[in-house]
Amino acid sequence: QTRANKFMWLGTAQLFDAFAFIFEKTEAGWIWAHAYRFDETRSTFIVECSEETWRGIGFDHMSQDDAIATCERIFARHLGGNPLLTNAGHLRGSAAWINFRRVLCERWSFDNVVLLGDAARTAHFSIGSGTKLALEDAIKLAEVMDRPHIAQDRASMAEALEEYRTERHTEVLKIQNSARNSTEWFETLDRYIDFAPKQFAYSLLTRSQRVSHENLRLRDPVWLGE
């Protein structure tokens, strides 16, 4: 399933203390970034917008360098003078912009090939669970493959791989449902963007339905009490 919004995966030397959502209004419409620090010197900076805004800004006919420079201007006050970085410099024109693809495979193994992570299923980047899910897949796969004599017994191998798929598939469905809710929230941003700031923040925080009103009360009772 291919989703509606366009996004470009970038990086920056600007460091963010926590996962940040940054919204900027342009003449063509709203554009936003999902930003988070991933090591001591770099942050991920994913730029996303509707296709209408994407075309309105002119990204559809810009070179990648021009598109990055445009994003640097749009988000300048959040970048502290740092440039935006790409590891996809080989892509021409608008090819660096992607529509997210939701993937869910029914079968996770065939013969001696086993899928994990995004190869088996995807979860939208707005909930930040892709790496976590892949590592949990690897842990479960290692667990079932480490059983005695499994390599010499094809029936036991098949049972182990089905246990891996069944257990991880159930967990993945929960995450994908939350990811779908989050994806759709960003795809329909116009419904929420004119809310009062606190109402907008509440909607943003609860968009996936993984975080409920009571979850927020536990995390920040003072803010919620306001």
Predicted feature locations:
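Conserved FAD/dinucleotide-binding core of flavoprotein oxidoreductases
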Residues: 17-102
